[in-house]
Amino acid sequence: MSSFSPREIVSELDRYIIGQKDAKRAVAIALRNRWRRQQLSDELRDEVMPKNILMIGPTGVGKTEISRRLAKLAGAPFVKVEATKFTEVGYVGRDVEQIVRDLVEVGISLVREKRRAEVKAKAHQNAEERVLDALVGTTASPATRDSFRKKLRANELDDKEIEVDVAETGNPGGAFEIPGMPGANIGVLNLSEMFGKALGGRTRKIKTTVKDSYALLVNDESDKLLDNEQIQREAVASAENDGIVFLDEIDKIATREGGIGAGVSREGVQRDLLPLVEGTTVATKYGPVKTDHILFIASGAFHVAKPSDLLPELQGRLPIRVELRALTKEDFRRILTETEASLIRQYKALLETEGVTLDFTEDAIDALAEVAVQLNSNVENIGARRLQTVMERVLDDVSFNAPDRGGQGVTIDADYVRVHVGDLAANTDLSRYIL
């Protein structure tokens, strides 16, 4: 779990997301509170519950991006799910408990990577011995092995082809679920693991070069040095105490008054989410997982439905409300120029691979922002995603002819932008279909 201060978290998010100060502060405080809780005494720690967050705002303003960046910062198990993918128990589809199972799987991957890094030196040493075994055999004299070891470390044998045994990864029987019994693949997986251990584990022979064999063998040797049961225990504890679940599109399962359609299933999903958000125990193949201290961040555009259309019980379990505002022309301008991997920087880098130097004037950036705002207000407000559409239209000709213009420079100014999208943006009816 990272120990960044709220100010540091907001500063890091500022590198990728423009504006939305309230949302950044809310997630920064929530993340810091996870760390604060870990510092408490055992009896008080169990009493401190996370304050779940509901982010409300139009599409394309940064709700999902904030969650993605937060996940990288947190260094904790994190899953992002769309609420619309789940159905009420009894309906065909995934049930909400799968969220927790996915969270534990993410936790296992994180803990395994961390433990692998700790034993990497020893694993590399063991991998080197296995490469030498493949090159000179296990019965070779120490002098021969030392001679080949020197060549190996001097990269003289990198291209030599060898045959090595590596552990079989994945379940050969394949995982499956019995309809109506989520998690029913648990028994199947455990049986295959038990038989695998009883038979000493499955291996397969592969032919590869000495250079390429190292990555496979180091992973293989790392896994031999790790205690799987310990990893599973740590992953479950990490998911329970540090886990973050981002529930996107929650407005799509809100039931509107007087609405018709799949209302029962929508309301059913909300009712299934209640115990998960409040705190329950979910059975996974790694053991029971308590959801009491998992942080839930829900988000939705709420164009049609309102937050008050959610079940009152679910509203009560999302106590922190944050509203994200629509983007202005100045925001679009900053998105194009100030973010860490801005669109302008991306397009410049892409065209540089063809030897084309791309340059944008200040008035071109203003024109791009203006067109994006105009289209969002006249057609449909899709937020910052509109910039991608506009940029693609503007640079269509340059991108297509780039291979023939190697070594040339292209300057995009306001007139160039207006020629390529200005007329189209002005014609609202045409814009609806093209932009």
Swiss-Prot record:
One of its GO terms (molecular function) is peptidase activity. Its main location: cytoplasm. It comes from the Bacteria. Pfam families: AAA, AAA_2, ClpB_D2-small. ATP binds at residues 18, 60-65, 248, 313, 385. GO terms for biological process: protein unfolding; proteolysis involved in protein catabolic process. One of its GO terms (cellular component) is HslUV protease complex. InterPro entries: AAA+_ATPase, ATP-dep_Clp_protease_ClpX, ATPase_AAA_core, Clp_ATPase_C, HslU, P-loop_NTPase. Keywords: ATP-binding, Chaperone, Cytoplasm, Nucleotide-binding, Stress response. It is found in: Cytoplasm. ATPase subunit of a proteasome-like degradation complex; this subunit has chaperone activity. The binding of ATP and its subsequent hydrolysis by HslU are essential for unfolding of protein substrates subsequently hydrolyzed by HslV. HslU recognizes the N-terminal part of its protein substrates and unfolds these before they are guided to HslV for hydrolysis. Belongs to the ClpX chaperone family. HslU subfamily. A double ring-shaped homohexamer of HslV is capped on each side by a ring-shaped HslU homohexamer. The assembly of the HslU/HslV complex is dependent on binding of ATP. This is ATP-dependent protease ATPase subunit HslU. It comes from Sinorhizobium medicae (strain WSM419). The lineage of its organism: Bacteria, Pseudomonadati, Pseudomonadota, Alphaproteobacteria, Hyphomicrobiales.
